């Protein structure tokens, strides 16, 4: 399996910004390439930049999602990927200290998991990883961004293990 990194620092799931997850996703054009899965971070930036969480839609129609809200953008991404590439969609959550909005977003993601049959790699609720991040201050650059050491010892092992299980 080969990975393609399309992440950009400081971007959001929701919104019409040219660097939003949605706009970057729409620009991807993989010709004659089998996509094994799309892995997407549950952004910590949406709340910081003032996007509302929104509501889970009852619809499965791509055009009905409110992409100016985080949940609407997530549902759009899921439907877009499932339609365009017919592959699993995997969201991973982040270590985030004292952020009630992010906790709510993680809880909503589990409701979306049921609706859309997506996968979640839950770093946010992983007690072992959170304890390790708190005990070694070199793991995190701030309350939500891992350092290289944090990626190496916190995120990479759980992502590799769970991606192997999912795929």
Show the residue positions of the predicted features.
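Extracytoplasmic/secreted envelope proteins and their assembly/folding machinery
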Residues: 22, 71-78, 106, 156, ...
